[in-house]
């Protein structure tokens, strides 16, 4: 009995000590953050999972492209931590959208959390990651030094935004990116090795930033190898917070949330990247624009290219790329989708996770249709595979990556798709040839294996050399170097 009471006393003593320690901790005040500094804790990006969507800032030399290019990092925070109430405004593009797409856009004003650009990395593709640097980084101190290991491309050039300007500073990020890209294009031409394309890519659901960058290196590297050097892209890879948890079970419940995020990404910063940076700069410099997405990444890229950005620049914010990095007309974010067809030369949807009816204009559960069936791009190419078990699980819509969708579309001449197939080596056969604005490819012979550390059957079998052959064949046919 004495031992029992002794044990109880020890337990109570331990509990008392623990409570006292917790009380003491509660009294400890955190060090004040100097004005102008934005920390992860302030804006809700401090958990181990959330840090994985800006991991390049911690490992700029290790988590990097194996060729020159840019990584644009988009994250998501509670809106009250990054922008004042009512700061999110829409451009005239909003009025041009279908009711379903307007509903998607409205989430940018109503969701508890908001997507924003947190960083842009410039990778040089050198040994040991030499020279990789931060072009834009919200996590900087008042002296312009990153709070993480990534260093500024130009010493002292990083000036993080005030916390409540984190969202609106996305326009500054895009202006900085455009100026850097313009310098790269001009420099490459002077060196006698001009770029042929601006190439933008977005990966899909449940993809951490480090994995997305590895995937970029695989896909783009294989396409460059397939071209024997004829394909020289100025690359931009955009990463986004596409994962909820390390638990596969928990992630199942994130499907609807993340497909909405993909739509919002296309209607916001990805759309703005195309409209304000990639398309006008490429037109000015004589380059082709190729945009590629996989799964929910294809959902985001199609929204950006086919519907366009609905975000308007805050009043007084200079237009991007006029008179230098910034300048020209004030405010508003005017303009639609680059004046109709021709904005993007080639949009490729690899195993897309969105409804084909967004393109065909037929009934969809969400009422979301692209204006004029995605007439804003010169050429649209979709792939489908019978071996993809991820897109076939959607019961409320015919996703573009599903072979059953391909069969329905290609049996109906009214859809205006030119249909064909890819062989196991990435060769394609389509009729008619380059004149078709829309092409649909049965890639079942090519997209056939379960990729390493992935699910959904062959949904992610896009990282092999043969897929690079397919991409180069599509680029050569629909968006050849000028």
What are these regions (language model features)?
Residues 2-13:
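Bacterial N-terminal signal peptides that target proteins for export
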Residues 4, 17-20, 31:
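Compositionally biased, intrinsically disordered low-complexity segments
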Residues 11-23:
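Bacterial N-terminal signal peptides
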Residues 14, 189, 336, 369-371, ...:
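Residues embedded in well-ordered secondary-structure elements
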Residues 15-18, 198, 289:
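Preference for short coil/turn "hinge" residues that link or interrupt alpha-helices
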Residues 17-20, 192, 339, 372:
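Structural motif
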Residues 24-254, 278-281, 325-333, 405-412, ...:
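Flexible, membrane-associating and regulatory peripheral segments of lipid-active enzymes
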Residues 26-39, 207-401:
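Serine-dependent carboxylesterase/thioesterase catalytic core
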